[in-house]
């Protein structure tokens, strides 16, 4: 995780893909519901 602004949320994995991050900022979804298991391990 390079930058804090890339986090999906306070309790979310910061290695989530960009689509998940933008969805979270737009309140359209979260890492848990959008994409699971891809970028969980850092």
Curated annotation (Swiss-Prot):
SUPFAM superfamilies for this protein: omega toxin-like
Tissue: Expressed by the venom gland.
Cystine bridges: 1-15, 8-20, 14-31, 16-42
Primary subcellular site in the record, as a coarse category: secreted
Any one Gene Ontology cellular component term annotated for this protein: extracellular region
Residue spans crossing the bilayer: none
Keywords: Disulfide bond, Ion channel impairing toxin, Knottin, Neurotoxin, Secreted, Toxin, Voltage-gated sodium channel impairing toxin
Similarity comment text for this entry: Belongs to the neurotoxin 06 (delta-actx) family.
Swiss-Prot/TrEMBL domain comment: The presence of a 'disulfide through disulfide knot' structurally defines this protein as a knottin.
Function: Inhibits tetrodotoxin-sensitive voltage-gated sodium channels (Nav) by binding to site 3. It slows the inactivation, causes a prolongation of action potential duration resulting in repetitive firing in autonomic and motor nerve fibers. Does not depolarize the resting potential. Does not affect tetrodotoxin-resistant sodium channels. This lethal neurotoxin is active on both insect and mammalian voltage-gated sodium channels.
Protein name per the record: Delta-hexatoxin-Ar1a
Organism of derivation: Atrax robustus (Sydney funnel-web spider)
Lineage: Eukaryota, Metazoa, Ecdysozoa, Arthropoda, Chelicerata
């Amino acid at each position: 995780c390079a930058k804090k602004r890339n986090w999906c949320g306070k309790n979310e994995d910061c290695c989530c893909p960009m689509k998940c991050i933008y969805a979270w900022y737009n309140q359209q979804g979260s890492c848990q519901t959008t994409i699971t298991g891809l970028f969980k391990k850092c």
